[in-house]
From Swiss-Prot:
HAMAP family: IF_1 (MF_00075). Pfam families: eIF-1a. Component of the 30S ribosomal translation pre-initiation complex which assembles on the 30S ribosome in the order IF-2 and IF-3, IF-1 and N-formylmethionyl-tRNA(fMet); mRNA recruitment can occur at any time during PIC assembly. GO terms for cellular component: cytosol. The gene is infA. Belongs to the IF-1 family. One of its GO terms (molecular function) is rRNA binding. InterPro entries: NA-bd_OB-fold (IPR012340), RNA-binding_domain_S1_IF1 (IPR006196), TIF_IF1 (IPR004368). The keyword rRNA-binding applies. It comes from the Bacteria. The keyword RNA-binding applies. It is found in: Cytoplasm. Residues 1-72 form the S1-like domain. This is Translation initiation factor IF-1.
Length: 72
């Protein structure tokens, strides 16, 4: 359920950083800085390096994103 104007892409977590930030490598080898969405944080969904995730990115800043789903 993405918002209008939001870009959804898939990637793989490369590195876990402090303050629930992650470096994610997209399928096109671009690396972005991502945070966890509020619903994932509320439900205590853990994200580790090598996890496949779905990101929402704003068209205005393509270097940051929000992790909205973790594949099992």
């Amino acid at each position: 359920m993405a918002k209008d104007g939001v870009i959804e892409v898939e990637g793989q977590v490369v590195e876990a950083l402090p303050n629930a930030m992650f470096r994610v490598e997209l399928e096109n080898k671009h690396i972005v800085l991502a945070t966890i969405s509020g619903k994932m944080r509320k439900n205590y969904i853990r994200i580790l390096p090598q996890d496949r995730v779905v990101l929402e990115m704003s068209p205005y800043d393509l270097n940051r994103g929000r992790i909205t789903y973790r594949y099992k």
